[in-house]
Every structure is written in C-alpha cells, then in structure tokens.
Amino acid sequence: MVEWIEIQYPIEYGEAYKMMKSRLTGILNGTASEAVFILEHQDVYTAGISAKNDELLNCYDIPVHHTDRGGKFTYHGPGQIIIYPVINLAVNGRVKDIRNYVNNLASLVINSLKFFNITGITVQDTIGVWIDSEFGRKKIASIGVRIHKWITYHGVAINVCPDLKKFKGIIPCGDRDTIVTSISELLDQKIDLDYYKAILKQEFYKIF
C-alpha cells in the first residue's frame, strides 16, 4: 500500500528533497513502503539537469536550487500543489518505462482537471500539461522526474492558485513562449486546496 504523506505547510525545497531521498533509500533497503508526498513549497526556483544559467532572469530574492530531476527551470510556491511519488515501477503490475510513467503523471493531472470542467492536454515534444484558451495555449502543470533502480522521485507540480507573476523570473522549462496559468485564473475563483488534494489521491489509484 502506498503511504500518502501530506505536509500541511509550505515546506522548504531542500527539506522535501531529503525526505524523498530518505524514502527512496528505505525502499531500496526494504525498510520503508512506497510513498507519495503531497505538499506546497516555499518560494523557490528549481533548475533541472538541462537548465541553462541564462534561463534565470531575475530571482526576486527567491532561492534557487539546482537539483537532479529532468528538465529546466521552474517555479514552486504556495498555491501550487506538488506530488512526489516515490514508487517502484518494477512491482504491482507497473511498467518499467520512463516515458510511460511521465505520460501517466500527465494523465493524472488531466483527469483531475475534469472535475473543474477544464480540458488539459499534452503537446507533442513537450513535457507537462497545457490548456487551450481564447488567449492561446498555456501551461498549467510541470513534470520533472528521476528514476533510480526503477524507483521514482520528484514528480508533478500543478498550478492551483499560485502567484503567477513569480514565473516571470525564469524562462519556464526553457521556452520563452511559455505562458503559465492556474485553475484559479481559468475559473476566476478561489480553489479549495484540500478539495483538490482529495481529487489527486482518488485519481492516483486509478492509474498507479
């Protein structure tokens, strides 16, 4: 059974990273169960292994963490719900395929958005979840993962109601044309974060 670990306060990125890695080590050693961390971060820009220095435009006194996930720069902060699955793709009928895993994370987000009558899509040659609006295509969720001995860590960040202005300090995912959005912006209303977390938990088990 996958253990859900919900952090009730915006957590510093480095602290959450240590928790992920500790759980990964425990799974490898047979001393810990699989887990999904569900949380919000304190303001932070994270740089994946493909990030370039010129993609950080202005950090606005926001900390920058270089990390070992795939991808480039992104922003995390309050109002953005993140799930970090630390699960073994070699067990429980799962598929040992990184692309399949990333696609499943995207499907999880797309399915969760349906509860708000929002149609999420994936776009060829990109990673993440997007929406098509009257103002063009916008990104609503970012995915960045790493897999060690078929155990996953890092995960997906969904913009529920973050401060979208803070994305202006970076070139999101290395694409200057990327425009970000959130559930709250699309619906023009406040979103209950606990309600959305419950949806993610429910939909997770339909896929994983």
Curated annotation (Swiss-Prot):
The record marks 139 as: Lowers pKa of active site Cys. Signal peptide: none annotated. Keywords: Acyltransferase, Cytoplasm, Transferase. Pathway: Protein modification; protein lipoylation via endogenous pathway; protein N(6)-(lipoyl)lysine from octanoyl-[acyl-carrier-protein]: step 1/2. GO terms for biological process: protein modification process. Belongs to the LipB family. Residues 30-208 form the BPL/LPL catalytic domain. The lineage of its organism: Bacteria, Pseudomonadati, Pseudomonadota, Alphaproteobacteria, Rickettsiales. Gene3D superfamilies: Bira Bifunctional Protein, Domain 2 (3.30.930.10). Its main location: cytoplasm. HAMAP family: LipB (MF_00013). The active site is at residue 173. Substrate binds at residues 69-76, 142-144, 155-157. One of its GO terms (molecular function) is lipoyl(octanoyl) transferase activity. This is Octanoyltransferase. Its EC number is 2.3.1.181. The keyword Nucleotide-binding does not apply. Catalyzes the transfer of endogenously produced octanoic acid from octanoyl-acyl-carrier-protein onto the lipoyl domains of lipoate-dependent enzymes. Lipoyl-ACP can also act as a substrate although octanoyl-ACP is likely to be the physiological substrate. It catalyses: octanoyl-[ACP] + L-lysyl-[protein] = N(6)-octanoyl-L-lysyl-[protein] + holo-[ACP] + H(+). The gene is lipB. One of its GO terms (cellular component) is cytoplasm. It is found in: Cytoplasm. In the reaction, the free carboxyl group of octanoic acid is attached via an amide linkage to the epsilon-amino group of a specific lysine residue of lipoyl domains of lipoate-dependent enzymes. It is an enzyme of class 2 (transferase). It holds the Pfam family LplA-B_cat.
